[in-house]
Design a protein with these regions (language model features):
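Transition segment at domain starts
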Residues: 21-85
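A short beta-turn/strand-edge loop motif at beta-sheet boundaries
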Residues: 96-100
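Beta-strand signatures of extracellular beta-sandwich domains
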Residues: 105-107
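Surface-exposed loop/edge segments in extracytoplasmic proteins
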Residues: 113-120
């Protein structure tokens, strides 16, 4: 019985160590285009005639550059707040890079402080271009800082102050 308990504990320990340590060695590159709006040709409406076209009304509202917090939690690249046909997004450009880690989320901050509960979405990847829709009712002018935050340990990885 002791051998079974010991084996189970070893397996759990291996899994936990892998979950904590593997992100430091594994990069996930994302390459998202700007969001698109779906349009439907009303003359020939059918389930097969839906077309997607790139949106022409893109407005850049704010921009900032990511910085890390220490040697273990580094970040770089461009963050933007953009508006496309009335919807507001955070856009991480192609040059975005952050140290990978467990349970990373994109959130908001103000005056150098992370706003708890402001998570927009789980970080899609630690490198490359990606989009995150701001919640409806959020004034894009009020977005001051974008944070990459480790929710499991309440640790900041990177932030961008937006101007």
């Amino acid at each position: 019985m002791k051998k079974i308990i010991f084996a189970v504990l070893i397996l759990v320990l291996i899994f936990v160590c892998y979950w904590f340590i593997s992100p430091l060695f594994i990069d996930k590159k994302v390459s998202e285009d700007l969001p698109v709006v779906e349009t439907v040709n009303e003359e020939t409406v059918s389930s097969e005639t839906t077309q997607t076209e790139p949106v022409s009304q893109t407005l850049e509202i704010k921009v900032g550059t990511f910085t890390g917090f220490d040697r273990l939690h580094t970040g770089s690249g461009t963050a933007k707040v953009i508006s496309i046909d009335g919807k507001n997004y955070l856009r991480f450009e192609e040059d975005f890079s952050v140290t990978n880690g467990p349970d990373l989320y994109v959130g908001l901050g103000e005056n150098g402080e992370y706003i708890k509960g402001s998570e927009l979405e789980k970080l899609k990847g630690n490198m490359g271009s990606q989009n995150y829709e701001l919640p409806e009712g959020t004034n894009p002018e009020d977005v001051k800082e974008v944070w990459v935050w480790c929710r499991a340990f309440s640790v900041p990885f990177a932030k961008a102050i937006l101007y």
